[in-house]
Amino acid sequence: MAKSKFRPLHDRVVVRRVESESKTAGGIIIPDTAKEKPQEGEIIAVGSGARDEAGKLVPLDVKAGDRILFGKWSGTEVKLNGEDLLIMKESDIMGIIG
């Protein structure tokens, strides 16, 4: 992705979905109409973090380049620089892969 001028605020992250396999382990090809949207992605950009009760800035646990798992209905779909991306809160992320 070309460097975007978009920077998420607070505890939000920008995620690019990682495409799922188009073939099963047994070699069956899955048509596009039967595929579900992948729940795995790569973080493209992160916000500066959220503030705790005392007003102290708490940085995010994830960083650009991390591969993550997120919920099926997580985030808001947006199009930036012609690319379909998701913007979600860090709390929508279930975990980091690898």
UniProtKB/Swiss-Prot annotation:
Gene: groES5
Record's keyword annotation contains Phosphoprotein: no
Listed HAMAP family: CH10
Keyword Magnesium: no
Keywords: Chaperone, Cytoplasm, Plasmid
Family per similarity comment: Belongs to the GroES chaperonin family.
Compartments, as annotated in UniProt: Cytoplasm
GO molecular function list: ATP binding; metal ion binding; protein folding chaperone; protein-folding chaperone binding; unfolded protein binding
Gene3D superfamilies documented for this protein: GroES chaperonin
Protein name, entry field: Co-chaperonin GroES 5
